[in-house]
């Protein structure tokens, strides 16, 4: 893997004053260039903002947070491409067939994004993506030393025939 795709629950934990010390410690030792966000994380902030009543004092705070994340991760903000959507369709269908339950849409789209970009999916929602095929890291519980990140230039993709 070449880096980390942060789920919204991880970004919220990192920036929260009362966030998990373990999650913050993990994030603090990562090379910033290896951390990525999906546009879906920004959309989840938009959803949270839209869900607040008019005049809610948290609205400007959440808007500033969203805008700061978008700016900070601008070069590492991953879109939902056609390839990712098609991979998500395959993941969702397979998980539903194998488990009998439809998987959460956003979580499995994040898993498809992580797979497409050769990233670990960093989330607390391990149960929601465990059948996706993505490599999942839970910073609340997992030992990060077991998750190697290789420099991009050393990474090799198998040749396609």
Predicted features along the sequence, with ranges:
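Short, well-structured N-terminal submotif of metal-dependent ribonuclease cores
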Residues: 1-41, 50-68, 145-146, 154-161
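Alpha-helix capping/helix-boundary segments
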Residues: 10, 41, 84, 110, ...
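Residues that scaffold the ATP/ADP-binding catalytic core of kinase and kinase-like folds
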Residues: 13-14, 48, 87-88, 132, ...
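Residues at the C-termini of beta-strands that transition into short coil/loop
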Residues: 39-40, 81, 125, 140
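Active-site neighborhoods of divalent-metal-dependent phosphate/nucleic-acid chemistry enzymes
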Residues: 47-52, 74-120, 153-161
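Acidic, PIN/NYN-like endoribonuclease modules and their adjacent C-terminal/linker elements
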Residues: 111, 115-161
């Amino acid at each position: 893997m070449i880096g980390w795709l942060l789920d919204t629950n991880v970004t919220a934990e990192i920036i929260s004053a009362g966030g998990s010390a373990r999650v913050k410690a993990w994030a603090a030792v990562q090379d910033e260039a290896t951390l990525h966000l999906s546009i879906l994380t920004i959309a989840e902030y938009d959803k949270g903002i839209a869900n607040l009543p008019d005049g809610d004092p948290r609205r400007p705070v959440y808007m500033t947070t969203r805008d700061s994340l978008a700016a900070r991760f601008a070069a590492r903000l991953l879109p939902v491409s056609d390839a990712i959507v098609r991979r998500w369709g395959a993941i969702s269908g397979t998980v539903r067939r194998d488990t009998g339950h439809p998987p959460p849409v956003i979580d499995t789209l994040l898993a498809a994004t992580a797979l497409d970009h050769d990233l670990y999916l960093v989330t607390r929602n391990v149960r929601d993506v465990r059948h996706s095929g993505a490599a999942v890291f839970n910073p609340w519980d997992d030992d990060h030393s077991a998750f190697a990140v290789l420099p991009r230039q050393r990474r090799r993709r198998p040749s396609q025939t």
